[in-house]
A protein has these predicted regions:
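Short beta-strand segments
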Residues: 51-53, 123-124, 151-152
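Short glycine-cluster motifs
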Residues: 149-165
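A structural signal for small-residue-enriched, beta-sheet-centric alpha/beta enzyme cores
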Residues: 4-5
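Flexible, glycine/threonine-enriched loop-and-boundary segments that flank and lead into catalytic domains
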Residues: 109-138
Length: 354
């Protein structure tokens, strides 16, 4: 899900999705069932529902299970393997949540030590599971808008690391340069993601090398999150017909992003925390006159500035503009659409020009 969906890769994914829709592969059909996927599969489902379950076996040392599932032509065997992967995925989610919490505490100390200006986040700790550190690095990039390197140290004195980056910072090249300088036992990657193996006694040198290299190329603007908008609309216009028109531009992913809209002159009809520990914020929107209804959700926004702003605007009845992408909402056979919220603005001009 970090490889650009352009050229041949885009063609392969598009064709693969067509094949998946036939449900002829017993393993994929079973996986879709345990994941609760009752909609037409798209690239988002690959990255967020099916892919994590296929990978879950590898994250707990049972990597063959995913390939066994995909190779199976026995529906009964496939269902059993899919349930096993689903269970491991739940374990992975619990493990990831605990590691993210631990990592955030370390990062807060690092950010404070550098006055909030560290160009690259770099954290290492013994006891972390190497199978989830890439996911943790992605969460850190998402929250802090800067490259992140997360390393799990084992008892032998080696560390397995994953790095994730932002646009404009080639983290793969940085990791390869560190390897060539003798700071890594192994390592490589591409502009947005990389992996590495490092001896514990090289951690400080690696941290300094990456910090210096990335600081040379990154600017304050690079570290300021920006959202590129593809259009502006009002709540009544965000409907299934629009989503169907946009879906013809897919499959979406790196290099071919899902169209992002500003939803202008909107109000919250409802907004509430949902999920484990209120991790997400779910809402219903109307336009400023009360016309239309649009379901919306902000993932992992609970307790974060985005979620707090949404709840405050709903409580105070404020007009808002939101930035996000549209996704099909087929819950219980309903052919609707919902907004995946990425940002919210209150008390500002709400015109297409602004």
């Amino acid at each position: 899900d970090m490889v650009p969906l352009t050229g041949l890769n885009r063609a392969l994914v598009a064709q693969g999705l067509k094949v998946m829709r036939r449900r002829a592969n017993a393993g994929l059909a079973a996986l879709a069932d345990v994941a609760g996927l009752d909609a037409t599969p798209d690239s988002g489902h690959l990255g967020f529902l099916l892919g994590p379950r296929v990978n879950a076996g590898g994250r707990v040392g049972q990597s063959a299970t995913g390939s066994d599932l995909l190779a199976s032509d026995d529906p009964v065997q496939a269902a059993a393997l899919a349930r096993r992967l689903d269970d491991w995925n739940r374990e992975r989610q619990t493990l990831e949540a605990a590691t993210v919490e631990d990592a955030l505490a370390l990062v807060e100390r690092e950010v404070a030590a550098h006055g909030g200006h560290a160009a690259c986040l770099f954290i290492a700790r013994a006891g972390w599971h190497a199978g989830v550190i890439g996911l943790v690095a992605s969460r850190l990039v998402e929250r802090y808008a800067r490259p992140a390197v997360v390393i799990a140290l084992d008892d032998s004195g080696q560390g397995k690391g994953s790095a994730r980056s932002i646009a404009g910072v080639d983290i793969g090249a940085a990791i390869i340069a560190a390897r060539q300088k003798g700071l890594l036992l192994n390592g490589g990657g591409h502009p947005m993601a990389a992996g590495l193996t490092v001896a514990a006694d090289k951690l400080e040198a690696l941290r300094d090398f990456l910090a210096e290299r990335i600081a040379r190329v990154v600017t304050d603007r690079d570290l300021t999150p920006e959202l590129t908008l593809d259009g502006a609309l009002r709540v009544p216009a965000a409907d299934r017909a629009l989503w169907q028109s946009l879906s013809g531009l897919g499959p979406f992913g790196i290099g071919n992003g899902t169209p992002r809209f500003a939803v202008l002159r909107a109000r919250f009809v409802t907004a509430e925390p949902v999920g484990r520990d209120g991790a997400h914020i779910r809402a219903i929107l109307s336009d400023e006159t009360g016309r239309g209804r649009l379901k919306a959700i902000a993932f992992r926004a609970g307790g974060q500035p985005l979620g707090q702003a949404m709840l405050a605007a709903a409580r105070d009845g404020l007009g808002v503009a939101l930035a996000g992408t549209l996704r099909a909402d087929d819950w219980q056979g309903r052919e609707g659409v919902q907004l995946i919220v990425e940002d919210v603005m209150t008390g500002a001009p709400q015109t297409a020009a602004s």
